[in-house]
A protein has these predicted regions:
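A short hydrophobic beta-strand segment most commonly corresponding to one strand
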Residues: 157-175
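His/acidic/aromatic-lined binding-pocket segments of jelly-roll/cupin-type domains
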Residues: 79, 86-89, 133-134, 141-142
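Bacterial N-terminal signal peptides
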Residues: 7-19
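Short, conserved beta-strand element in jelly-roll/cupin
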Residues: 82-97, 101, 109-124
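Short alpha-helix capping/helix-loop boundary micro-motifs
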Residues: 127-131
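Conserved metal-binding segment of the jelly-roll/cupin
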Residues: 134-156
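Positively charged n-region of N-terminal signal peptides that target proteins for export
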Residues: 1-5
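A short, N-terminal "cap"/entry segment at the start of jelly-roll beta-barrel domains
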Residues: 19-82, 174-183
Length: 183
């Protein structure tokens, strides 16, 4: 299944570029690269692996994330990316992912922060109730459009997942390769 998702990442990054005749080369993200960047997470929950310009003023990024055990009652801590769409591919573990619903007490990330300029684009965080809850586990794929609040209400142990980020405003740095894997 991971090979299929990596193939989808290659197709997403290659097809628009070929259609626009901007490039005839695909961008690969190998399992070895994912593992190498994952090993550097440390206290962070999110690291970018690569960002590629796919044409039509759009970048696509691939990041690796891991979150530890979590249990909430009522309000869920959430994030909203104003323009960036995310596609999660769950590698290990699982939990309850909640999407939608109104975001309350929103705090915007500083526009010059690494979170905005390297990882997720312009975004805010806050809490929300309601929305749609779904159980996710290894092998599942979830698409979260830009502007949709999302967060986990429960993670029994941990969850490790890839985030494929479609950045229509090219805020994320095209050509970025995580220094751990840069050749």
């Amino acid at each position: 299944m991971l090979n299929r998702v990596l193939g989808m990442v290659t197709m997403v990054t290659m097809f628009p570029a070929v259609a626009l005749a901007q490039s005839s080369v695909a961008t690969d993200v190998t399992r070895a690269e994912i593992d190498a960047v994952y090993e550097t997470l440390g206290g962070s929950i999110d690291k970018q692996i690569k960002v590629v310009d796919v044409g039509k003023s759009t970048n696509v990024a691939v990041g690796i994330l891991e979150r530890g055990a979590l249990e909430t009652e009522g309000q869920v801590g959430a994030i909203v990316h104003h323009d960036v769409t995310e596609v999660y591919y769950i590698l290990e573990g699982g939990g309850t992912l909640v999407t939608g619903g109104p975001l309350e007490d929103t705090l915007e990330f500083p526009p010059d922060s690494a979170a905005v300029t390297e990882l997720i684009g312009p975004s805010g965080r806050g809490t929300f109730q309601g929305g749609v809850s779904r159980e996710v586990s290894a092998g599942d794929v979830v698409g979260i459009p830009g502007g949709v609040p999302h967060g986990f209400s429960r993670i029994p142990d941990r969850i490790k997942y890839l985030s494929i980020r479609v950045d229509p405003d090219q805020v994320l740095p095209a050509g970025y390769v995580n220094p751990v894997i840069e050749k």
